[in-house]
């Protein structure tokens, strides 16, 4: 899976499409057709799933977890994490460890 191998990088749609020898527009259309999601949504969801694992299984700081999954800006990482999970990374880490 290309996303699994490249999610830590600034992995663009163009690079993903090139990896499978498709035009980016056509690749995007196929992704949407077969997954119901855009490339950006798939990448974001994959990154957040990895972040959740790291938050639960390590003592890494939130900003470091964000960097490990491809987000250089800690505020942007927190915003995206909250959009996907409904809570901030700190809230997620605290709730999961309490429960």
Language model features with spans:
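Terminal helix-turn-helix DNA-binding modules in bacterial transcription factors
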Residues: 1, 5, 10, 33-72, ...
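Residues within the alpha-helical elements of helix-turn-helix
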Residues: 19, 68-69, 84
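Residues within helix-turn-helix
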Residues: 14, 25, 61-64, 74-75, ...
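C-terminal accessory/binding modules appended to enzymatic or scaffolding proteins
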Residues: 15-24, 28-29
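Short hydrophobic/aromatic patch on the recognition helix
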Residues: 27, 31, 76-77, 81
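…primarily DNA-binding HTH/wHTH and HhH modules…
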Residues: 79-99
